[in-house]
Amino acid sequence: LGLAALTRREARGTLLRHIMISFTNISGAEEIGANCYLLEMDGTRIVLDSGMHPKKEGKAAMPDFDSLEPNSVEAVFLSHSHLDHLGTLPVLQEKQPAAEVFMTPAAAALSEVMLHNSVNVMSAKRLDLGIVEYPFFTHNDLDRLSDAWHAKSCNEVFRVGFRQNVLATFYDAGHILGSAGVMLEGESGHTVFYTGDVQFEDQSMIPGADFPESGVDTLVMECTRGGFQRSAHYSRPEEMVRFGKAIEETLERGGAVLI
């Protein structure tokens, strides 16, 4: 997406506000990968997610952290604990030690497990594939850095930034346990809502997203399958039956099933 600068004047009551927002994709763009975005609003620099590309190895799997000035990021928001949104968070923290990191309590618990497992996987790849950059961080690094995470519940309003000038609120995204979109409101009153990955339908164990239905000035939304029309005959129960049959057929012919 590159750098998108939005400047506008708008009347709120009797006050005339000047709004400056910039949004920069530092994740590689145009594919599912190392999700990471820089949002600058009212002078506050915020990073949304810090993922690792699932199909690349070594430094090529990381976002472009070199585009961030050292120690310039004030807050980091994690939408959920899948590695394409989480996998390089400790690297970002080392490069941006002044940044506070925010996520939901469930995301914090899952992220710790996911990242410790990632250390094991990267260490094995270093030995098996000779990828000398791995691991990006160690178990000890993770234990130290995770102490700086702040767990915030959905619908809890809190302030972020060096000047505490941005209001933040998580909303349940329905994607996985602990997933959340985040509403950010600058001192100008302009709001930005970042969805992260979202699922609006109820799943077997996770209810669908509970997002705000108003009050959003700028929306940043995932659209992984946004270009595809869902069949008019689609239903979740029927898809579950199809999925079960596919598993059964695979096992009957001696195949393996990884979920």
Walk through the language-model features, giving the residues of each:
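Short, Lys/Arg-enriched N-terminal segments with co-localized hydrophobic residues
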Residues: 3-19
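His/Asp/Glu-rich metal-coordinating catalytic cores
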Residues: 21-77, 82, 86, 91-259
